[in-house]
Amino acid sequence: MKGYVESSLLYSTWSEVACIGDAVVGFLFGRIEKTWKGRSRMRTLLVELSMTARFLLRNPLMLARSFGLMWNVWITELKLAEHRPRSDAEIELLIVDSKNRGEGIGKDLVDRFITAAKEAGAEVVTLYSEDLQSNYQFYEKYGFRRVATFYDDVTSYFANKASTAIIYALDLKQSTDTERQ
């Protein structure tokens, strides 16, 4: 999980943490394209490859499985490139502690991100999720629409069972706050 969070943070230009008292109960990492200024995508990719190599070298069993993992990552990235619509912003990672779900924390985090994206001139927000652990009903209730699904090679690899990737998009020109109540 730590590596997944670090990777998501690498590609993010916006982050927010939700706390109740001293406890972190949720966070959202997102990318708003117009705020990417001065960041090198190649450098970001190299940092992510370095993180992945460190992870694989720590565990000999993972190193042996690394070729399978890399193949699955490559295939999934190709599918994402094929199916993901053009967007100005993307939710990289949204997590709310299971004990605090249903309290409006996720909605508040997404509302703040959407507001920042609109203020930056974004027109479309996308997100990539999967069917095994995602609360996809939350995204659909919020107003995101499914634009693509495909076999998720990476999640299936780690879960050791079939998983479907889901790509969502929210058109900010058509979306209003009253739709998401």
Where are these regions (language model features)?
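Glycine-rich phosphate/pyrophosphate-binding loop shared by adenosine-nucleotide-utilizing enzymes
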Residues: 22-27, 89
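Conserved catalytic-core motifs of GNAT/GCN5-like acyltransferases
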Residues: 128, 145-162
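Active-site rim helix/loop that mediates acceptor-substrate recognition in acyltransferases
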Residues: 1-15, 19-21, 29-32, 50, ...
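Conserved acetyl-CoA-binding loop-helix of GNAT-fold acetyltransferases
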Residues: 96, 102-115, 141
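Short hydrophobic/aromatic beta-strand element in the GNAT-like acyltransferase core
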Residues: 13-17, 27, 93, 165-167
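Conserved acyl-donor/pantetheine-binding loop and adjacent beta-alpha core of acyl/acetyltransferases
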Residues: 35-88, 153-161
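Hydrophobic adenine-recognition pocket in adenosine-nucleotide-binding enzymes
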Residues: 94-96, 129
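Conserved GNAT acetyl-CoA-binding A-motif
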Residues: 88-89, 117-130
